[in-house]
């Protein structure tokens, strides 16, 4: 069971202690839950040796402790067939303990269980629909007669009788928490049937329900459980236990859930303060609310105070203008670490803006530990998906690992939304057999429902990570087939963007980080933006499109902040492709922009430079820029490490033009006599956009002709209805004919002049020259000792016979 911790880091001989608290302790009274053979609600069976180890005898009453601080009491019997560290119990006992098969429970002796004087037992309302007759005679009497069953207050148990099985709940027992129902015990079953409380109620979140934060969970448990359960540990070493934890991370990553789980599993008193609620209009009222909360918690120690959205009540004091906020911050500071020490009270704060909290709160003694609950990685996402789908009916073809791979940048909440969406998709398919008017739905319809892989794929298409909600880009459905020509450009792009996402281990093996930037340049209308769309669609990364000019705002310092935010978002939902269209609007050469908004463009460019290759670590964020004025872009952007791959996208040649015609007309019906090759030959110097325009225009003519024919036919049929019947036969197929293309070619025009093309080619050539510097370089042969001739500058240094200054 504790294998995970030891093998967590095989390379170093040292054991990783950071998650030590999560490991199961070995002790003889911890047993693994197994399915029962005989179905009795009050009996659990163990191997005789296990019984001997625990000093139990056949028929002893034992107390079993399960998850979420639930326990129940049962009678222990020996069973030779049960394996050693296992305990067999049926479904009723398991649900009372909130455990599943394979979980671990602890068994304790429970010697002095009294015979009960009276017990109060009520049925659960949804199991007794249509049951007639006296419940007591039919169900309870045969169940308890001569059986001496132990019961625990709050337990549910299932009784089979006649044709039905009914669930009952033990509402009250006298004496105390548990007792044995003997023949002289009075059983009350008067009263309204109980409503079933949801077994998985929200306030019953356990550690099992939090996935993807294993390391953080371990840290939180050391900080919370150790001081609350064993304060003497810290006393014996002589340090004060930590008292505050600040959880921060993007919204939806499970901060509040973790706090709930901790409170439930430790059994501490849980006091929740929602930031904005303690504000009040009366002076001094808000502070006293805070004081009351802390006093309440100290009365009920050990306790946990959870302050959600702490940035709303403890902002930086310099920045706030209101007097009230400052007083509240001061009050919080003194409460958390004032002269009066607080014992056994742990404060957990949660926020997604840790930098807007007053810095005095973030020192040791107040919030000692700051735990970053980030976006989960692939393993974490798989855990979260398993948790959300554990109660769903999944068909066999659902591949959760695959889904976890495809959901880059999703946090827990997004994965929950994904599962819900998949289930809804499943329900929508069955809507034709579900009638909303009916009272009940057929059982076979309900049983036939299962969520398939297809439903998940549909849901994946409609959902996106919440970090990207405001910069959301509908991932365009452009694939590589839509792009005619440009074969080698496509290949380079795939290598730049798809390899690092799909084969990260290769890069690690060769010890290099992949290049992160590409700049497309070339005449307008050649498919630069289209390429970026295709790569966003083909590679499973998230895609943020940034239009250059919209980053600039009128406020000072705001434009740079926009750049920073975009990069932050991209990092949160990595791997991510950032596409800057019209890059020249924000990346002009510095110093050239005189007088525009106090040089805002220059500052934006500086921010861009530092974000792309500054001190902060880049995760897998790819930057693709597109521009048709490469000559005015600041050279600092074009150095390797920022936009290191400069790809010139030229006007298409004849083959590419043929491909573009094909790609444009993929879905259109074309007459047999249209020769696309001839069209491609005649459109020398046209860009991709011009070619698309030719196709659109030809389409327009075809549609016009078609509509005119329809009108003509209707008129004829009105004039003489008899002739209509023969006429419908020779209705020709609607298609784009050669005549339409000829008509369309009359209006065709080139959007890029020759002078422009020459400019682009000159720029491309200068880049080629600066690039091809070491084309003569060869490694010297191993036998060849003389390497003097390999220096290209030595020959041009004007003969070596002159005295060289530097020799």
UniProtKB/Swiss-Prot annotation:
Membrane topology term: Peripheral membrane protein
GO cellular component, one term: plasma membrane
Residues holding ATP: 249-256, 522-529
Region described as Disordered: spans on this chain: 1-21, 771-807
InterPro entries attached to this UniProt entry: AAA+_ATPase, AAA_ATPase_CDC48, AAA_ATPase_domain, AAA_lid_3, Asp_de-COase-like_dom_sf, ATPase_AAA_core, ATPase_AAA_CS, Cdc48_dom2
Gene Ontology molecular function: ATP binding; ATP hydrolysis activity; polyubiquitin modification-dependent protein binding
An annotated GO BP: proteasome-mediated ubiquitin-dependent protein catabolic process
Subcellular location(s) per record: Cell membrane
Ranges annotated as biased composition (Basic and acidic residues): 8-21
Presence of keyword Membrane: yes
Matches recorded under SUPFAM superfamilies: ADC-like, Cdc48 domain 2-like, P-loop containing nucleoside triphosphate hydrolases
Keywords: ATP-binding, Cell cycle, Cell membrane, Membrane, Nucleotide-binding, Repeat
Record-stated family: Belongs to the AAA ATPase family.
Function: Probably functions in cell division and growth processes.
Protein's recorded name: Cell division cycle protein 48 homolog
Organism of this sequence: Glycine max
């Amino acid at each position: 069971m504790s294998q995970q911790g030891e093998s967590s880091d095989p390379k170093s001989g040292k054991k990783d202690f950071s998650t030590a608290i999560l490991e199961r302790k070995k002790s003889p009274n911890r047993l693994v839950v197994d399915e029962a053979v005989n179905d009795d609600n009050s009996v659990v069976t163990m191997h005789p040796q296990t019984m001997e180890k625990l000093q139990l005898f056949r028929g002893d009453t034992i107390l079993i402790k399960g998850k979420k601080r639930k326990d129940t009491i049962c009678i222990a019997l020996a069973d030779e067939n049960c394996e050693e560290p296992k305990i067999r119990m049926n479904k009723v006992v398991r649900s009372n303990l909130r455990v599943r098969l394979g979980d671990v429970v602890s068994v304790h002796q429970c010697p002095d269980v009294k015979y009960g004087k009276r017990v109060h037992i009520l049925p659960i309302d949804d199991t007794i629909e249509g049951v007639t007759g006296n419940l007591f005679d039919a169900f309870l009497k045969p169940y308890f007669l001569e059986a001496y069953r132990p019961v625990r207050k709050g337990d549910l148990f299932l009784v089979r009788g006649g044709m039905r099985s009914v669930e009952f709940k033990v509402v009250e027992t006298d004496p105390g928490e548990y007792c044995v129902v003997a023949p002289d015990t009075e059983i009350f079953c008067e009263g309204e049937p109980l409503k079933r409380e949801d077994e998985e109620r929200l306030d019953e979140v356990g550690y099992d329900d939090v996935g993807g934060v294993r390391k953080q969970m371990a840290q939180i448990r050391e900080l919370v459980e150790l001081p609350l359960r064993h304060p003497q540990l810290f006393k014996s070493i002589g340090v004060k236990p930590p008292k505050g934890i600040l959880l921060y991370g993007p919204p939806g990553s499970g901060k509040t859930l973790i706090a709930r789980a901790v409170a439930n599993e430790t059994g501490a008193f849980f006091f929740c303060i929602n930031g904005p609620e303690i504000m009040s209009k009366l002076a001094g009222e808000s502070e006293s609310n805070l004081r009351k909360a802390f006093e309440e918690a100290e009365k009920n120690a050990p306790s946990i105070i959870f302050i959600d959205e702490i940035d709303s009540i403890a902002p930086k004091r310099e920045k706030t203008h209101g007097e009230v906020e400052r007083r509240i911050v001061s009050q919080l500071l003194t409460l958390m670490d004032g002269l009066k020490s607080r014992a056994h009270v742990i404060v957990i704060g949660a926020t997604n803006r840790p930098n807007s909290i007053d810095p005095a709160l973030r020192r040791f003694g107040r919030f000692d530990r700051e735990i970053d609950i980030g976006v989960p990685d692939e393993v974490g996402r798989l855990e979260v998906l398993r948790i959300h789908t554990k109660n769903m009916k999944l068909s066999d073809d659902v591949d959760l690992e695959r889904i976890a791979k495809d959901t880059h940048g999703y946090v827990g909440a997004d994965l929950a939304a994904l599962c819900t969406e998949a289930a809804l998709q499943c329900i929508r398919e069955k809507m034709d057999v579900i009638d909303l008017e009916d009272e009940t739905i057929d059982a076979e319809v309900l049983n036939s429902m299962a969520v398939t892989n297809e439903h998940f794929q549909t849901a994946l298409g409609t959902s996106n990570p919440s970090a990207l909600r405001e910069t959301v880009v509908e991932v365009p459905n452009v694939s590589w087939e839509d792009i005619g020509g440009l074969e080698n450009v496509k290949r380079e792009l795939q290598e730049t963007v798809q390899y690092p996402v799909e084969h990260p281990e290769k890069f690690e093996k060769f010890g290099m980080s992949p290049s992160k930037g590409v700049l497309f340049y070339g005449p307008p209308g050649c498919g630069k933006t289209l390429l970026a769309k295709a790569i966003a669609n083909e590679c499973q990364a998230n895609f943020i499109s940034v239009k250059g000019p919209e980053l600039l705002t009128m406020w000072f310092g705001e434009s740079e902040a926009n750049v920073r935010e975009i990069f932050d978002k991209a990092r949160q939902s990595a791997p991510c492709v950032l596409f800057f269209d019209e890059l020249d609007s924000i990346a002009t050469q510095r110093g050239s922009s005189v007088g525009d908004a106090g040089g805002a463009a220059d500052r934006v460019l500086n921010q861009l430079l530092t974000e792309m290759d500054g001190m902060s670590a880049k995760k897998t964020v790819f930057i693709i820029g597109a521009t048709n004025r490469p000559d005015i872009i600041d050279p600092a952007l074009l150095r390797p490490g920022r936009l290191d791959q400069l790809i010139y996208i030229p006007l298409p040649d004849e083959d590419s033009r043929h491909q573009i015609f094909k790609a444009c007309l993929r879905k259109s019906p074309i007459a047999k006599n249209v020769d696309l090759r001839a069209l491609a030959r005649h459109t020398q110097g046209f860009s991709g956009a011009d070619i698309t325009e030719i196709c659109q225009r030809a389409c327009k003519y075809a549609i016009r002709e078609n509509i005119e024919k329809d009108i003509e036919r209707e008129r004829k049929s009105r004039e003489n209805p008899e002739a209509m019947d023969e006429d419908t036969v020779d209705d020709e197929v609607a298609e784009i004919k050669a005549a339409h293309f000829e008509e369309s070619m009359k209006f065709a025009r080139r959007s890029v002049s020759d002078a422009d093309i020459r400019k682009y080619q000159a720029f491309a050539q200068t880049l080629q020259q600066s690039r091809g510097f070491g084309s003569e370089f060869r490694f010297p042969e191993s036998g060849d000792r003389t390497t003097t001739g390999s220096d290209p500058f030595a020959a041009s240094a004007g003969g070596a016979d002159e005295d060289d200054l530097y020799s």
